[in-house]
């Protein structure tokens, strides 16, 4: 009998094959039974709703109320426990949700460059955070709002029957599994190569009631959910209060502008993600090195250097190269560099699209000496703007039917994703002997001009981050 891991990998390959059957504007992936309600759960829901009392509600504490700091180590330990308890179906569901998040992430990323204006800077987007934020709102949505959110998430439905509806609890649990699978790998050899923390802030106008089942459901996605109330009538002051609160609680660099909000806004729904990846066997160079923003402009930036046997491929036809640097057995950093800096936009269009992972099959092992910038990036973006830019249904600018979130009048002011992304050296264990540097078969790869990157985890088929670095010192 084949090992369970082999069987799981084979099934994931089948899912990937189905994923290629996308048509038109909407992506169709099978089998959807992994993420929708089945007849049994529909019957349970019907019985529970019959004569069900009103959901208990509460008013969030004021934003100035004292709050304990987030314990990131405890968060990582919880994710490791989540991963350890996954059965085969849970892992398949995580892979399914990972692919759905990839498709949505590519769709949004492919339309956002002009909106962000990142030609001379650096930025990072998390497909899983985008998907998680919209799935969280779906948890609180009803009727037409729920229909449109389900369509954006990539799961079609045939009718209004319960068995065609996305199961938000399954999806949010799967998203936590996706995070757990990434983090747990770095613990296998007692080395925490990867850190991934997610915090949700639910900021409401004073007096607005939140439903307890909604907030409890968010804990399936992340155990740190922070409901707080504040006055939105002075938007600059409100944004400053939210930033100050989140930085005090997390210690991360965050960004909240409330640019899309108005004085009658009653809700800001914000997702904050911190990623830290350690480059095994890499070291920080003693002196900053030149990074060429364009043919005539350079900046001095901290650089990492390391050597190892990495997967690599150079596309002579489209003039770009890809280097895959492993974090763990199944998680890696993908580095994509145009041969000519002026081709960054073209290469971005070629590689960051729905079938882009196909070129990973062309990678082959090479002994490489790699030099690249140390990355500390912060990116904040309002999903309302990104959905509009991607020509997806612009449902977040209007009054929504979020009656599973609150019975009060809801007017969404902001749906923020804030990413704090760090890439640093881990000098505990060299990947290869540096004595090999002068051997002719060693390929020198130096990322000293604009490039793209992605963090990919094969175990959940999930692209956790997509990024563009035109200037490591300037972030969007």
UniProtKB/Swiss-Prot annotation:
First and last residue of the signal peptide: 1-24
Gene name for this UniProt entry: AGT
Places the protein is found: Secreted
Disease tied to this entry: Essential hypertension: A condition in which blood pressure is consistently higher than normal with no identifiable cause.
Protein name: Angiotensinogen
Family affiliation: Belongs to the serpin family.
Subunit structure as annotated in this protein's UniProt entry: During pregnancy, exists as a disulfide-linked 2:2 heterotetramer with the proform of PRG2 and as a complex (probably a 2:2:2 heterohexamer) with pro-PRG2 and C3dg.
Keyword Magnesium in record: no
Native source organism of the sequence: Homo sapiens (Human)
Statement: the UniProt record of this protein carries the keyword RNA-binding: no
Tissue spec. comment: Expressed by the liver and secreted in plasma.
Molecular function as annotated in GO: growth factor activity; hormone activity; serine-type endopeptidase inhibitor activity; type 1 angiotensin receptor binding; type 2 angiotensin receptor binding
PROSITE patterns noted in UniProt: SERPIN
């Amino acid at each position: 009998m084949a090992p369970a891991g082999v069987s799981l990998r084979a099934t994931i390959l089948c899912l990937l094959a189905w994923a290629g059957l996308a048509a038109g504007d909407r992506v169709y992936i099978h089998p959807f039974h992994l993420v929708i309600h089945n007849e049994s759960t529909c019957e349970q829901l019907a019985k529970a709703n019959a004569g069900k009392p009103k959901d208990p509600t509460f008013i969030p504490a004021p934003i100035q109320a004292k709050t304990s700091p987030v314990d990131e180590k405890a968060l990582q330990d919880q994710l490791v426990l989540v991963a350890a308890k996954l059965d085969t179906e849970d892992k398949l569901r995580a892979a399914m949700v990972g692919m759905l998040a990839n498709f949505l992430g590519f769709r949004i990323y492919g339309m956002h460059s002009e909106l962000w204006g990142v030609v001379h800077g650096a930025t990072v987007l998390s497909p899983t955070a985008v998907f998680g934020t919209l799935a969280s709102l779906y948890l609180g949505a009803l009727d037409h709002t729920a229909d449109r959110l389900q369509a954006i998430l990539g799961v079609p439905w045939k009718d209004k029957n319960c068995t065609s509806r996305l199961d938000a609890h399954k999806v949010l649990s799967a998203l936590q599994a996706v995070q757990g699978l990434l983090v747990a790998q770095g613990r296998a050899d007692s080395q925490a190569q990867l850190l991934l923390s997610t915090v949700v802030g639910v900021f409401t106008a004073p007096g607005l009631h939140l439903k307890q089942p909604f907030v409890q459901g968010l804990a399936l996605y992340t155990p740190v959910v922070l409901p707080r109330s504040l006055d939105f009538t002075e938007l600059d002051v409100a944004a400053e209060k939210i930033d100050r609160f989140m930085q005090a609680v997390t210690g991360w660099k965050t960004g909240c502008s409330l640019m899309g909000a108005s004085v009658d806004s009653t809700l800001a729904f914000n997702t904050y993600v911190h990623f830290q990846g350690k480059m095994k066997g890499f070291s920080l160079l003693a002196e900053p090195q030149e990074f060429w923003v364009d043919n005539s402009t350079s900046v001095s930036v901290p650089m990492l250097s390391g050597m190892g046997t990495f997967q690599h491929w150079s596309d002579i036809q489209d003039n770009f190269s890809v280097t895959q640097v492993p974090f763990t057995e199944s998680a890696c950093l993908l580095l994509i560099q145009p041969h000519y800096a002026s081709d960054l936009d073209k290469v971005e269009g070629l590689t960051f699209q729905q079938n882009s992972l196909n070129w990973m099959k062309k990678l082959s092992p090479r002994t490489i000496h790699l030099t690249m910038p140390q990355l500390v990036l912060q990116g904040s973006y309002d999903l309302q703007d990104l959905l509009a830019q991607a020509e997806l249904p612009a449902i977040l600018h209007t009054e929504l039917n979020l009656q599973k979130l609150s019975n009060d009048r809801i007017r969404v002011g902001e749906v923020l994703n804030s990413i704090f992304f760090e890439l640093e050296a881990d000098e505990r264990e060299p990947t290869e002997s540096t004595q090999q540097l002068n051997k002719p078969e060693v390929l020198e790869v130096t990322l000293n001009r604009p490039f793209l990157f992605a963090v990919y985890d094969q175990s959940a088929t999930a692209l956790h981050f997509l990024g563009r670095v035109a200037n490591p010192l300037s972030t969007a």
